[in-house]
């Protein structure tokens, strides 16, 4: 009888120590998702960042043991279809579709072999003065390092549009911005668009519902927190990274602190 009791005690010890710790570790993962915009060597512009600063940030992440993972892997974890992530996992995204992504970001991405998700809005592609072209987007896609996802059709301010349109007009506008832009990207790029970044970080319950109806499985804001399972699928936060933040601020962001200009 004594050997059986000892065996049973060992099994209980394994059950109440190892397993709960594993589950707790998986549940408590916080994922910093970084949001970049335009890369400009001469800086002017509130959302700009020099390529040199970007490279220094990537190098710091690499030197300090961070693993830059594809956004889709983070999404799988947040949705519960992936049980765990590498230690110190972090995600790189870039919004809008600036040509500087091709000119300045691409060489650094290749150098460090890191995955990036681009959130672009079709209205500007091949039309905007400093925007990417469809051919450039395809080149980025073909590197295997860039995943292209949605950022609505015109990058409009939903709060302003809601105030200036009738309820029916606004509903039609939202459908074009979400479902319409999704189809355009899918037709041009031949890939499934399932992720969305909210322009100006603006979202509400109605927009979240419409995004889900349009076929998006997760959407991202710029609410300056680490993403985790406590957030709704259509409002996962990101940290916006700009030149006005010092390296000390960047490090604090990665640690989960709110970003502040220093």
Enumerate the predicted regions with their spans.
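Short, electropositive alpha-helical surface patch
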Residues: 202-218
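Metal-dependent polysaccharide deacetylase catalytic core of the NodB/CE4 family, i.e.
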Residues: 29, 34-41, 88-90, 98-99, ...
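Bacterial N-terminal signal peptides
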Residues: 8-20
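Surface-exposed patches in mature extracellular/periplasmic domains of secreted proteins
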Residues: 46, 69-73, 121, 192-198, ...
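A cross-kingdom marker for long, charged
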Residues: 225-253
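N-terminal pre-catalytic segment of deacetylase/amide-hydrolase enzymes
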Residues: 23-90, 245, 253-262
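Bacterial N-terminal signal peptides that target proteins for export
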Residues: 1-9
């Amino acid at each position: 009888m004594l050997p059986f009791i000892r065996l049973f005690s060992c099994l209980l010890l394994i059950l109440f120590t190892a397993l709960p710790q594993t589950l707790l570790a998986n549940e408590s993962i916080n994922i910093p998702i970084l949001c970049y915009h335009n890369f400009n060597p001469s800086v002017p512009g509130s959302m700009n960042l020099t390529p040199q600063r970007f490279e220094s940030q990537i190098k710091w992440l690499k030197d300090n043991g961070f693993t830059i993972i594809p956004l889709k892997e983070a999404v799988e974890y947040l949705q519960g279809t992936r049980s765990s992530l590498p230690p110190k996992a972090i995600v790189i995204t870039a919004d809008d579709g600036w040509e500087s992504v091709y000119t300045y970001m691409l060489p650094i991405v290749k150098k460090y072999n890191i995955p990036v998700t681009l959130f672009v809005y079709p209205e500007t592609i091949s039309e905007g003065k400093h925007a990417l072209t469809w051919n450039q987007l395809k080149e980025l896609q073909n590197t295997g390092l860039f995943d292209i996802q949605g950022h609505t059709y015109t990058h409009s301010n939903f709060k302003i549009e809601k105030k200036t349109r009738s309820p029916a007009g606004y509903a039609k506008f939202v459908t074009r911005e979400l479902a319409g832009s999704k189809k355009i990207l899918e037709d041009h790029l031949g890939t499934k668009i399932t992720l969305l970044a909210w322009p100006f970080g603006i979202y509400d319950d109605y927009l979240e519902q419409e995004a889900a109806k349009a076929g998006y499985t997760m959407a991202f804001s710029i609410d300056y927190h680490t993403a985790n399972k406590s957030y709704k699928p259509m409002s996962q936060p990101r940290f916006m990274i700009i030149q006005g933040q010092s390296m000390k601020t960047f490090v604090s962001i990665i640690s989960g602190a709110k970003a502040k200009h220093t």
